[in-house]
Amino acid sequence: TPNLPLRYEISNDGTGPASSMQHICATVISEGGETNGTGITHFFGNGNTPVSCATAGTVYPLLAMRLKSTHLGTEVRPLDLHILSRTSDDYEWRLYFNPTISGGSFSFSAHTNSAIEEAVGDGTLTITAGQIIDGGLINSAQKGGAGSHNVDNAQLLGSAIDGTRDVLVLAVMPLGSGTVNASAQATITWKESL
């Protein structure tokens, strides 16, 4: 699986001398290549409950996803993102990989028949830092304030050797200044490879 970290280990049963090992390099190779078309697609969004985005220049998470702790080897590829402005506000949207969340934490729940756990923003959580792997702008005057985007990124969800799982977060930042009382909704579609 491409998601898990490489690991070296040396052990001693207690009867031999102390030993050491020097790690020089490692590689992961897929024989036969990848079949990008094989997999099961899944979808989730925040339904009929928009996320309040009250302050311009503040980044609000709309949706978050991570691997279930029992499915760390599953290859998950985001396919499509859709964002809708429920107000007459413009946004910059961002797709974050392992962002820093302020104001609390996500409440993840299992997505049915999937390797993913999902969470939705609540208007109190914000993002202060993190790796942005995709983004764009949504103009409320165009297409009813909606935006869609096909995701094309090789960054996959995985975990650290201690089991800490990566989190992918779709977020928006209202443009302008001061209090804007904006709200937005989003959906995400992804594929789990077989």
Pin down the residues of each PLM region.
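Beta-strand-centric surfaces of beta-sandwich/beta-rich domains
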Residues: T1-L194
